[in-house]
């Protein structure tokens, strides 16, 4: 009875807060503490319910109400948990993006940790192939120096140095002979005439070694022929004719270089069958045939260009007609390209006059007139400036 009186003397706000804080726990404790002689008075938290039911209620009805509230609360929490998946999906997508970023971080850290070991391995590989790397750098430097010098001498025309051209010829020939003499035991010069060098077993690096050296030597050989043409006096072979010879030699060099690596690569591809079973041998034959087909397609793809070069070389198309003195006087007798008096003036189809040598050098790279941009030449005459292709034919 004292406990019930204490409940009566408690302020309504306190009872309301306790009921709101733990309604189910309060109902259970109340139900468990009832005795036959005690009187329990239910204090409702809502004013509406208090006005409708001023009398005391059955404890079980309070328990049921509390149970209903607990079930309703659980249902609401369950409904909220089902309404959250879109947020969860957004969170998962964010985690996926952060996961991919973390993978890149791990990869970067792995590279940082592995860098010393990669350097050690790289130094070891360089030391194993130091001869080939040094020789490749030397051949490339020689080619760049000779190619630039030949182009400069062709551009100078009558002012070119015969001594410089002779030095380039001796330098290229001496470099080739010294290289083959140093490695005479391998008979690398055999590959120039479509024969295999004297190597028992060809590995991948040895194939690259043979093909690379042969390609540079062929370039040196045709560059030496260009030096010989430079040494020919202009009264025997005009500069215009020399340009056509440079173009023809370069095209011949490129087509010859297409076929030279074929025997070496064919032997390397087909050599798999010597140490394997029938399947491996068949695979080697198939790879070799596929290589030959690709080389033939490459050749026929360049055949059209080669025919155009031959047609230009034999027909020697003109860009105009010789200009008269009256026509030159109308142009003040000065060539707009060289800013000097006309030397063998040529009247283009667009009625502009230039020196024959000046306009020939111009059309080595361009198709249009220098002044009015009228198309005069149908094709660009490549390689007439004496240049050599820097492409390395490794296959």
Swiss-Prot record:
One BP annotation, GO: positive regulation of ERAD pathway
Pathway recorded for this protein: Protein modification; protein ubiquitination
UniProt keyword terms in alphabetical order: Endosome, Membrane, Metal-binding, Transferase, Transmembrane, Transmembrane helix, Ubl conjugation pathway, Zinc, Zinc-finger
Pfam families: zf-RING_2
GO MF, one annotated term: ubiquitin protein ligase activity
Tissue: Predominantly expressed in testis.
A cellular component annotation (GO) from this entry: endoplasmic reticulum
Zinc finger (RING-type) stretch: 335-373
InterPro entries: RNFT1/2, Znf_RING, Znf_RING/FYVE/PHD, Znf_RING_CS
Chain residue ranges for the region called Required for ubiquitin ligase activity and for protection against ER stress-induced cell death: 328-379
Its membrane topology: Multi-pass membrane protein
Region (Disordered): 1-58, 78-97
Record protein name field: E3 ubiquitin-protein ligase RNFT1
């Amino acid at each position: 009875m004292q406990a019930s009186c204490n409940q009566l003397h408690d302020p309504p706000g306190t009872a309301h807060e306790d009921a709101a804080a733990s309604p189910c726990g309060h109902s259970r404790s109340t139900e468990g503490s009832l005795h036959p002689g005690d009187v329990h008075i239910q204090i409702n938290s809502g004013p509406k319910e208090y006005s409708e039911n001023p009398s005391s209620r059955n404890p079980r009805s309070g328990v049921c109400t509390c149970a209903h509230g607990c079930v309703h609360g659980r249902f609401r929490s369950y409904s909220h948990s089902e309404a959250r998946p879109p947020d969860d999906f957004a969170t998962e997508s964010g985690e996926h993006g952060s996961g991919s970023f973390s993978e890149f971080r791990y990869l970067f850290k792995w590279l940082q940790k592995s860098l010393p070991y990669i350097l050690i391995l790289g130094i070891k590989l360089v030391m194993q192939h130091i001869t080939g790397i040094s020789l490749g750098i030397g051949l490339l430097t020689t080619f760049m120096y000779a190619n630039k010098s030949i182009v400069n001498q062709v551009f100078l025309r009558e002012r070119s140095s015969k001594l410089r051209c002779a030095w380039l010829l001796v330098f290229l020939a001496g470099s080739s002979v010294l290289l083959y003499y140093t490695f005479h035991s391998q008979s690398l010069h055999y590959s120039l005439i479509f024969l295999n060098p004297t190597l028992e077993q060809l590995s991948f690096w040895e194939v690259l070694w043979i093909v690379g050296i042969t390609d540079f030597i062929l370039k040196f050989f045709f560059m030496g022929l260009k030096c010989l043409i430079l040494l020919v006096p202009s009264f025997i072979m005009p500069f215009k004719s020399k340009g056509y010879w440079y173009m023809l030699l370069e095209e011949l060099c490129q087509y010859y270089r297409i076929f030279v690596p074929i025997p070496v690569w064919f032997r390397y591809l087909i050599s798999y069958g010597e140490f394997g079973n029938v399947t491996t041998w068949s695979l080697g034959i198939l790879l070799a045939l596929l290589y030959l087909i690709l080389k033939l397609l490459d050749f026929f793809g360049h055949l059209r260009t080669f025919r155009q070069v031959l047609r230009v070389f034999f027909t020697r198309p003109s860009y105009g007609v010789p200009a008269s003195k009256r026509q030159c006087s109308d142009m003040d007798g000065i060539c707009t390209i060289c800013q000097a008096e006309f030397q063998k003036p040529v009247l283009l189809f667009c009625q502009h006059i230039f020196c024959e040598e000046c306009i020939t050098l111009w059309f080595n790279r361009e198709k249009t007139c220098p002044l009015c941009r009228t198309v005069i030449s149908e094709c660009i005459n490549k390689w007439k400036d004496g240049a050599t292709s820097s492409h390395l034919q490794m296959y």
